[in-house]
Amino acid sequence: MMMTDLPENIRKTAVALLRLGEATAEDIAKITGRKRSTESYYLNLMADLKLVKKKKVGRKIYFIFNSRDQEKRQ
């Protein structure tokens, strides 16, 4: 799946994650201006599609693009 295939609302989340590299839903929300819960929902949808992976550190969950997907975009 290409970035352009994503709906606009999820694409905004994806672009923010690309800028940050690795981020929590709260980090993404600061960039997009949307609620943390909204970003969490979109990030989890992207995880379900195997576009991003989750990394739990303590109580925080960080999201990062899968390496294979990142290579396709470059």
From Swiss-Prot:
What PROSITE patterns does UniProt report for this protein, alphabetically? HTH_ARSR_2
Q: Does the keyword Signal apply?
A: yes
Q: Give the matching InterPro entries.
A: HTH_ArsR_DNA-bd_dom, Tscrpt_reg_TrmB_N, WH-like_DNA-bd_sf, WH_DNA-bd_sf
* One Pfam family, short name: TrmB
Arranged from A to Z, the UniProt key words for this protein are: Signal
Q: Which SUPFAM superfamilies match?
A: Winged helix' DNA-binding domain
Molecular function GO labels: DNA-binding transcription factor activity
Q: Where is the signal peptide?
A: 1-25
Any stretches that span the bilayer, and where are they? none
Q: By its UniProt entry, which Gene3D superfamilies does this protein fall under?
A: Winged helix-like DNA-binding domain superfamily/Winged helix DNA-binding domain
Coiled-coil region list: none
The molecule here is called Uncharacterized protein AF_0529
Q: Which organism is it from?
A: Archaeoglobus fulgidus (strain ATCC 49558 / DSM 4304 / JCM 9628 / NBRC 100126 / VC-16)
Q: Give the source lineage, highest ranks first.
A: Archaea, Methanobacteriati, Methanobacteriota, Archaeoglobi, Archaeoglobales
